[in-house]
Amino acid sequence: HMVWGLHPTLPVKKLWFFPGFTDRTGGLLIEDGLDEARRAFDAAAWRRAHGARDGLRTLFFFAYPVNAIDRLAAGLRAAGEPLNLMLAPGEASDMLERALKGDARFNVVRLPFVPQEEFDDILRAVDGAVIRGEDSFVRAQLAGTPLLWATYPTEDKAHEIKLDAWLARFRDCLLYTSPS
């Protein structure tokens, strides 16, 4: 973070800026009024307006096609719980929908791509989310939504480094906030 480097193809310098959770990063950009917006949001009304069935838990799914989608589908089936599945556009959602096809316990709702403000509404409306990417990862936490972070595997294992760093930070937070 805050390191100057050369652009790979142009004769210009770049300043690397990385968001994050420590003093060695650029921190997180959190807009004013976020807590008030979260408290004022009517999640049940949003779910009804977007095709969710009342009385079911709702999971938002936004992953990469390289993630373990068949294993997720098998786990959802094995859990035996009826569920609203709000699927973001993309191949990964197509794969999950095919894997769960014919199982009436799952109310599958296909959502369109939306602007950031509406994406935050999705995250506020659901009981949990499978999300991809660093931005979605942060926005889900800011929405207070339990999440499974579906990282994109890279050859240099950067995804594992990011995940391990977050898990270490999360464990520290749990220890700090633990009632015991």
Regions found by a protein language model. Give the residues of each.
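Short, hydrophobic beta-strand segments that form beta-sheet elements in well-ordered domains
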Residues: H1, N84-P89, A129-I131
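A nucleotide-sugar donor-handling region in carbohydrate enzymes
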Residues: H1-I69
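Short, aromatic/basic amphipathic alpha-helical patches
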Residues: M2-P8, L76, L96-G102, K162
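Short hydrophobic signal-anchor/transmembrane segments that target glycosyltransferases
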Residues: R71-E81
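Catalytic donor nucleotide-activated moiety binding site of glycosyltransferases and closely related
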Residues: G80-P112
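A donor-sugar binding/catalytic signature common to diverse glycosyltransferases
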Residues: F113-K162
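Post-HExxH zinc-binding segment in Zn-dependent metallohydrolases
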Residues: K162-R171
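Conserved small/polar residues in nucleotide/adenosyl-binding loops
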Residues: Y176-S180
